[in-house]
Amino acid sequence: AGQHMITVEYDDSLPEGQYYLYMFNNNYGKATSIPTFDWSMYPNVGNFKSGTSYYSKFLVDEKTRTYKLAQQFSLPYSAIVSSVQHLGGNIPFSSGMSKTFGEYDKDGKLIKSFEYEADKYSYRVMKYEF
């Protein structure tokens, strides 16, 4: 299933060879290169118009060649585009197709969200500290 904006996050508290990957997990099932792919084998994968997107964070261990889900919470659905980032201990996000952006705290509790009207989707929303 689809994802958007994967970020590598190194953490000095982790053992050597470990790091985090976090992403806006669109959770949209489409494979244009394999049009006959059977997405029914993957329960809860969204279609273009509806589904559930997620903030997903994985702990990667290169020494053992494994990964595990470290944190996940649902976001407003968007089959395409969208973004998440880590900033100041919080998680700003944008969900392009739902025309929503906002911020969650580190535990996945919504702080504030905004909706906008537009003919097109926002590709990304980034927050900066000046």
Predicted regions and their residues:
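Histidine-/acidic-rich catalytic cores in large beta-rich domains
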Residues: 1-130
